[in-house]
Amino acid sequence: MTGNPAAPAATSVSPPAEQPYQELGLTDDEYARIIATLGRRPSDAELAMYSVMWSEHCSYKSSKVHLRQFRDTPLTDRLLVGMGENAGVVDVGEGLAVTFKIESHNHPSFVEPYQGAATGVGGIVRDILTMGARPIGVLDPLRFGEADAADTARVLPGVVAGIGGYGNCLGLPTIGGEVVFDPTYAGNPLVNALCVGVMPVDRVQTSAATGVGNAVVLLGAKTGRDGIGGVSILASATFDEGGGPARRPSVQVGDPFTEKILIETCLELFDRKLVTGIQDLGGAGLTCALTETTAAGIATGQPGGMEVDLDLVPLREASMAAHEVLASESQERMLAIVTPEALPEVLALAERWGVLATRIGTVTNSGRLTVRWHGEVVVDVPPGSLADDGPVYERPLRRPVDFDLVRADAPTPARLARPRTGPELRETLLRLVASPNLCSRAWVTDQYDRYVQAGTVLAQPEDAGVLRLSAATGLGIALATDGNGRYARLDPFAGTQLALAEACRNVAAAGSVPIAVTNCLNFGSPEDPEVMWQFAQACAGLAEGCRRLGLPVTGGNVSFYNQTGSTPIHPTPVIGVLGLFDDVTRRTPIGFAEEGDVLILLGETADEFGGSEWAWVTHRHLGGEPPAVDFAREKLLGEILVAGSRDGMLTAAHDLSDGGLAQALVESCLRGGHGARIILPAGSDPFVELFSESAGRAVVAVPRAEELRFTDMCEVRGLPWRRVGVVDGDTLDVQDAFTVGLDELRAAHEGTLPALFGRLT
């Protein structure tokens, strides 16, 4: 079957009236480009397809010129699949590969918090499944407005319930993430989701539709009207001043049970080698899946093309129009390419699992994507024009007008009053550990099943989530996500590098070697030159940092238009890092569990409070420069942490970041159930020592018998270290400053979120 380049049938269904391309998010130039590409006016269905595929969400038209530099990050021997696929894949040894990726579902989660978050999890899980992997874990970096704001009370409980409800039903442990509160996210919550999966190295799947005559099979749920316009309206437009999109589409509705059996069906299809190509249906639904698989097939150099009959698509609503069927973002659907010989077996296997499977088309050699509806051709397009050859913009950049002023407003002692006496330091500590961004996340994480599948070794509140891949050998992985919008507001280049450095520190503190990076870049409108300058700086910072650390960027996501009216969110790059264990039994937790262990501070502390939690919590101040980043020192610190864990020299390790040494000590004491006696250097400023947020630091607990061996290693490698105390008792005692009991710390640390959002029953 071949398509007709002139496509007279498609032309015949185009209405004579002016087409509403601007309402669909297309510019005059883009509409003219479509006409030039087709040699005619597009049909309604074609116009809808171009509008979603050329949206910011699908085409990356404003970000692509900056993302290209990630391809220059190191291509390590472990990297099997890099940028451009549904998710990156790395070889972890023992015949296994791991795939991981982070995505956003920000705008839908504001409109419908439960379903927006739930389908965000479902979508990233299918991305991992599409690569051929069994999903084994989820992380959820979340950001909301002020903790006590009425809108946060509406959004946060629904988001948490949606993530927990969907992930728990799938049997996926939620092993990590973040919860951050800041007024910048009022009306623009960030709901990012990372999923990781594992597979045999020889089971990596491709999305390419190849093999003339092969069947195109739709698997999973029926198609309805939910989510129509999601990528072009929710994901590619700014909220108006009223807190919602001017054009409100329906948010997708998730069904985790259908997703679960779809996962098992696909994994069996992969194991039995019954598919030649596979693609999930996420943003832009069938439009995206059909165009990307067809374009990928043609890109292989083999004869390609596709003909599809929309009348064969199982519908939930019989009255749907062709463009609605193509644009629907109904969840729990996959598109498979199957040989005619394998088709009966595929259909029988799906029936056995209770999964709807329908042949809707055929791979052709036409070089075009042709779609029929009620006997007429409603789409006849070159698929590359939708999937690969859309508009690319090099938008203007302008450094924010207040950039220098904000950075000059440093939180110096002359600018912001600092605690000096022991009682003042004690009060500051209690206030910080109870603050929304530093308090316990148990109210959130207790709603997630962190240990289902029995593969979880460490989970929140640990520095990284750790999963066992092999019970026989102990092979395992660690994952962490980090981001700090305040740092990035002060300096998007340095702020992004700080997020990368912290995520690497987190997986190294757990005992694993960082091996790969993913990212979710959350920004305001790309039409704002100041936002685009921030974005360009963030991309450059991440690319340079990865080159310095020797880590590949395997893929990620860009989420633009996170703003209300003309006010964007702080630039918020969220960085995910994958770490590798030879043996997860050597992992290092954060808790101080052994009385008498020596506490050693690794790294150097400076007076660095720009963008700090202390400055915000005590003074509502955001200004100055963020902490400095030294990647050579970060890499050395990571190597020391991994060696100490591997060689049995550490009983606990915790990276230092928000809240500084004081926050890390509180978290480790409460996690392990033991107190600590701390001695600060003579002549030092206790406030700086306790609350500075200098990067490149960690606190470790070392058995006395291992102290000399560990410190000798630090000396030989050139890593600064200092003995700061000992694990002891049931108080946190800072010599000559203050003492506070663990019970008082626990009450302050654990009481905040239940007081704000209600106690869990």
From Swiss-Prot:
The keyword Isomerase is annotated on this UniProt entry: no
Similarity section: Belongs to the FGAMS family.
Keywords: ATP-binding, Cytoplasm, Ligase, Magnesium, Metal-binding, Nucleotide-binding, Purine biosynthesis
Binding site for Mg(2+) 1: 103, 557
List of residues binding Mg(2+) 2: 127, 280
Lineage: Bacteria, Bacillati, Actinomycetota, Actinomycetes, Frankiales
Binding-site residues for ATP, renumbered to this chain: 60, 101, 519, 556
Described purpose of this protein according to its UniProt entry: Part of the phosphoribosylformylglycinamidine synthase complex involved in the purines biosynthetic pathway. Catalyzes the ATP-dependent conversion of formylglycinamide ribonucleotide (FGAR) and glutamine to yield formylglycinamidine ribonucleotide (FGAM) and glutamate. The FGAM synthase complex is composed of three subunits. PurQ produces an ammonia molecule by converting glutamine to glutamate. PurL transfers the ammonia molecule to FGAR to form FGAM in an ATP-dependent manner.
Residue sites binding substrate per the record: 104-107, 126, 252, 329-331, 559
EC number: 6.3.5.3
Name of the coding gene: purL
Annotated protein name in UniProt: Phosphoribosylformylglycinamidine synthase subunit PurL
One Gene Ontology cellular component: cytoplasm
UniProt feature, compositional bias: Low complexity: 1-16
